Amino acid sequence: MDFLAQVKKAVELRLATEPSPPARSLPLVDFSKALGEFGIIAEYKRASPRGVVRLDMPPWAYFAMLQPYAAAFSVLTEPYWFLGDYRFITMAKPFKPVLMKDFVIDNRQIDMAYGYGADAVLIIYRLVGREKAMELAEYAQRLGLTPVVEVDNLQDAKEAATWGGKVMLGINARDLATLEVSLQKAFEIAKALRGDVDFIIESGISKPEEVEKACMLYARGVLVGTALMKNPALIKELRHAAESCVSRR
């Protein structure tokens, strides 16, 4: 069984026992506008399929520390591989707009994102396929959420770029079949899409020059997880690179 098949099976088991979502009490923010011309999306990620990233950083401390520099936060809610929790959304929300990241296969997960206060939700094209990804993206938009449709190849990216609405693409440098990371591949996809659709670049970003490269390709932002979890102070350098690039492009 490959990784994505394992993921779908695990999510199906979760959905069988998950409670109903809470009623939303937090304001809804336009995630795209929050990024400005180019923003750093700081991700709270305690673990990944490769293992533990960091467990000694409380979520509220992370959000407070990075709030002055991040345009938005990404929060992992998947509990098995990422040690995530829906409650992390509510913790992040007072500081910045929030993207919920999970293996979303059902509208009920989008309801949970909405109920806990997220402003955007990740939908992985390769996990659910074209038709289901479109359905989930449309449902998210009906709730007022920004669907960030994650792609890891040019064919899927070009298809999703035609969907219109509030859809934003998340170009993932990580191949979900092998879990290998290639920023160069992500940059090539971004170059091919330039001007067609709003997009961010995910995975593998850890250096100011990588932020600048993404910015010069007219990405709307970069999502940085592991590097900031291990060294939150790095965001100052990344933010400086972003501001410098925006002033020159």
Swiss-Prot record:
The keyword Lyase applies. The keyword Lipid metabolism does not apply. InterPro entries: Aldolase_TIM, Indole-3-glycerol_P_synth, Indole-3-glycerol_P_synth_dom, Indole-3-GlycerolPSynthase_CS, RibuloseP-bd_barrel. GO terms for molecular function: indole-3-glycerol-phosphate synthase activity; phosphoribosylanthranilate isomerase activity. Keywords: Amino-acid biosynthesis, Aromatic amino acid biosynthesis, Decarboxylase, Lyase, Tryptophan biosynthesis. It catalyses: 1-(2-carboxyphenylamino)-1-deoxy-D-ribulose 5-phosphate + H(+) = (1S,2R)-1-C-(indol-3-yl)glycerol 3-phosphate + CO2 + H2O. Pathway: Amino-acid biosynthesis; L-tryptophan biosynthesis; L-tryptophan from chorismate: step 4/5. Its EC number is 4.1.1.48. GO terms for biological process: L-tryptophan biosynthetic process. It is an enzyme of class 4 (lyase). Belongs to the TrpC family. This is Indole-3-glycerol phosphate synthase. It comes from Pyrobaculum arsenaticum (strain DSM 13514 / JCM 11321 / PZ6). The gene is trpC.
